[in-house]
């Protein structure tokens, strides 16, 4: 497991700067991550995020009809409490999806026990689960370790928590940013997990943001929906949507001058996009981060549909893995995205190289482009491992970016052996 910070120097803005501290960088949050014996490996598998003074919570969730009960519990409790949530417990190794009535009972037993220990109401506690579908949570193991989990709560335990939520991930996914707004230092933290079964619809895998700003629940919910669209809903690894996809965001602190809310949202987008790209790059068996940029579409919605269609194309992804500048596969994916455009207006670049223009391929050196791709496939994680594909499809104002990864034979091996 690689715990190094992820190329923070490349992710800056005019206002927001990367800092250490992960999910607990903002004031008002503590975290913990321990081993409760849920994983045969003995690795950390139980995490807790806690806001002692309370927080405003909003989230987006999987649209799967076969979603796990923990997703319904989160949705119901956020709605019933108008976002007043103080804790979320996360177990890895057991998805607790498709486990019948037991899934509901187990989720409620764990949150009830945790609420008692923290002296909260059950409605203030959420639960998220990740792991093998059909496997129930070992409730006795979890509940017998809740005291240890609570005693491990600490401002410095952000890496413990980020490790405890992982399953097949090879990389820890955590980040924090800070800005000074109106003379006040504001921090945003995040952590996530995800490596396979990633093609979210309204959410993604398990992802968490924290912020030390007080925000109205309705306003916060609107922000988080927009953040999800520009980040977690813009990535794909394998085209599969999980039963447990959850993105939760917590805000706790003094209210911010409304003049700075747009800058706050910029920071939320920045943080979520870093986590989203980390997930896409850590796709099972992946060797590079694939970025699809679409410009000139009639709307952002059309551009997003095109970008995600190309990013999720198995033929495009395998061509990238083979360092093959096969523009035909990209154009074919463009054509089935369900949007209108004139092929004679289309221009295509792989990295800095223009490959296709005004409806016809250009005379380019395939070996040079292939070597460019090959170098990125052996690049350092989230530093020089980006292969960018850019399309201009017209003169419209619509644009969007999606992220994915190459598709290798290792992905097949990992998933063929997943439960065996």
From Swiss-Prot:
Transmembrane segments: none annotated. The record marks 203-204 as: Cleavage. It is found in: Cytoplasm. The keyword Transferase applies. The active site is at residue 204. Its EC number is 2.3.1.35, 2.3.1.1. It catalyses: N(2)-acetyl-L-ornithine + L-glutamate = N-acetyl-L-glutamate + L-ornithine; L-glutamate + acetyl-CoA = N-acetyl-L-glutamate + CoA + H(+). Its main location: cytoplasm. Substrate binds at residues 167, 193, 204, 284, 415, 420. One of its GO terms (biological process) is L-arginine biosynthetic process. Keywords: Acyltransferase, Amino-acid biosynthesis, Arginine biosynthesis, Autocatalytic cleavage, Cytoplasm, Multifunctional enzyme, Transferase. Pathway: Amino-acid biosynthesis; L-arginine biosynthesis; L-ornithine and N-acetyl-L-glutamate from L-glutamate and N(2)-acetyl-L-ornithine (cyclic): step 1/1; Amino-acid biosynthesis; L-arginine biosynthesis; N(2)-acetyl-L-ornithine from L-glutamate: step 1/4. Heterotetramer of two alpha and two beta chains. This is Arginine biosynthesis bifunctional protein ArgJ. It comes from Prochlorococcus marinus (strain NATL2A).
